[in-house]
């Protein structure tokens, strides 16, 4: 595999929470191929068709652990047993509409779960880098026509978005209180950052209320694709885009622990911030057939219509920027869904990672 990190991850003990999820499975595959000793901590995958299941990554990594991040005691035990050096915290309740049904569980998972991971890091002798993954929806969304910068207020209308805003506030508090850069090497040895990405797409995602899985399920069933929010504008990006940013950030934090421990946006190119309807049209184009059906409901639960990220900071300070435009993102995503039935999915994922790194 192409290694843009110059053997940095080879032999590193890397703990990934949420490794059975969509982003977590792709991150675990990438890290494993780079020679990292991956410790996965998560609950069961969502479906038997998830990327985690079909790729078999759970059988390849150092440890594949079923545990709930709401169990702080268990988290500390896992950190003590496996001695991770780098932590990527992705485990979450990730759905806006579901958060209206289970608001308390959403907060318990996204806020207290995040705090439990930071507390496990605090008592660990091994952890040097913690990258906490939240979301672009953590910002107080005014539906403005320019992107949110990292220094803008946290907020959120619905329980999911606000729980991620609250998690960001907790991360900032723990950084100041327990992982303060001014005290690095004296009172602690942890560099802690948070990262915010846009609407991530890619192969192996079957979650509810997401445009790509909804499209693929309809296409495979020979039905029209129902579009709930055709005019909603989202910052679309392929899953490998933000993951490359998270991994680059962790490398830089390891090398310069007090310089990069803050919040970071990893969003798409400006031209990839497009309406849901346009993305669905691209899915149909690259899949080869299909029809769209506008089923928008004026009385539906509130979801933000416009949300954009400013990625200037990551560009200038990390040297990271998106490699693909929206059409390339959708094409690579659809490629996975067209091939997963009849191809080794782990090999397919490796092929897509290499293509992502080679072609852009």
Regions found by a protein language model. Name each.
Residues 1-197, 201, 340, 356-357:
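N-terminal Rossmann-like NAD(P)+-binding domain of SDR-like oxidoreductases, especially those catalyzing
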Residues 9, 19-21, 87, 117, ...:
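Generic structural signal for small/hydrophobic residues in well-ordered secondary structure
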Residues 17, 108-111, 160, 164, ...:
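Short, solvent-exposed loop/helix junctions and linker helices
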Residues 31-37, 67, 199, 219-360:
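C-terminal substrate-binding subdomain of Rossmann-fold SDR/epimerase-dehydratase oxidoreductases
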Residues 50-53, 142-145, 205-209, 239-240, ...:
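Short aromatic-enriched loop/helix-cap "lid" or pocket-rim segments at secondary-structure transitions
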Residues 58-59, 151-153, 177-192, 215-227, ...:
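A short C-terminal helix-loop "cap" of Rossmann-like NAD(P)-dependent dehydrogenase/epimerase domains
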Residues 72-73, 85, 97, 104, ...:
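Residues in well-ordered alpha-helical elements
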Residues 114, 208-213, 246, 280:
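Amphipathic alpha-helical segments in well-structured domains
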